[in-house]
Amino acid sequence: MGFGDLKTPAGLQVLNDYLADKSYIEGYVPSQADVAVFEAVSGPPPADLCHALRWYNHIKSYEKEKASLPGVKKSLGKYGPSSVEDTTGSGAADAKDDDDIDLFGSDDEEESEEAKKLREERLAQYESKKAKKPAVVAKSSILLDVKPWDDETDMTKLEECVRSIQADGLVWGSSKLVPVGYGIKKLQIQCVVEDDKVGTDMLEEQITAFEDYVQSMDVAAFNKI
């Protein structure tokens, strides 16, 4: 398992593809798995890697809380696609790994059991929370105006970046380009959110993080369903 070398474009592409249908490296909440991979990435992925950049900006917002995130941090080779081998940090990192060898045995098995138990507990909590939810879930329909920098902005790519944002309780709907003047068009896109899971502040933070394409975001309409 792994992402290849996360300090290279090829490794970041693997990460981007892996996150195309995921919000986090593992599970439904930020965890030490995200911290481990985040720390292996040397900086923000390029704007054309929408999924990786969206994930990077989101995990970066947990900088102060990363030590308290759930889970047990493992080596990079424990995460990612099973068909890819981790090669991040070869050389000096390999020497460090040699220094960390435990000549009197290993507690990897114990850590694995602990991680497994933690995952099972989180899954049980998640299922319990789902079971206790009321039959009627409060939802809202939101119409967003996403404005580009100028008339040369690739609006197809901008929309792709916006739709790459995924979250539990968020469903993207129809969209269209609306002229605003001087040859510039804004993206007007509909979404339905579960009120207790997704807010406009979260949407604005993640959409404007694609700063190579997005100048600003406004809520054009907000209706309770």
From Swiss-Prot:
Keywords: Acetylation, Elongation factor, Isopeptide bond, Phosphoprotein, Protein biosynthesis, Ubl conjugation. Belongs to the EF-1-beta/EF-1-delta family. InterPro entries: eEF-1beta-like_sf (IPR036219), EF-1_beta_acid_region_euk (IPR018940), EF1B_bsu/dsu (IPR049720), EF1B_bsu/dsu_GNE (IPR014038), Glutathione-S-Trfase_C_sf (IPR036282), Transl_elong_EF1B/ribsomal_bS6 (IPR014717), Transl_elong_EF1B_B/D_CS (IPR001326). Catalytic subunit of the guanine nucleotide exchange factor (GEF) (eEF1B subcomplex) of the eukaryotic elongation factor 1 complex (eEF1). Stimulates the exchange of GDP for GTP on elongation factor 1A (eEF1A), probably by displacing GDP from the nucleotide binding pocket in eEF1A. Pfam families: EF-1_beta_acid, EF1_GNE. One of its GO terms (molecular function) is translation elongation factor activity. EF-1 is composed of 4 subunits: alpha, beta (alpha subunit of the eEF1B subcomplex), delta (beta subunit of the eEF1B subcomplex), and gamma (gamma subunit of the eEF1B subcomplex). Interacts with elongation factor EEF1A1. This is Elongation factor 1-beta. The modification Phosphothreonine is found at residue 88. GO terms for cellular component: endoplasmic reticulum; eukaryotic translation elongation factor 1 complex. GO terms for biological process: response to ethanol. The modification Phosphoserine is found at residues 42, 83, 106, 174. There is a cross-link at residue 147 (Glycyl lysine isopeptide (Lys-Gly) (interchain with G-Cter in SUMO2)).
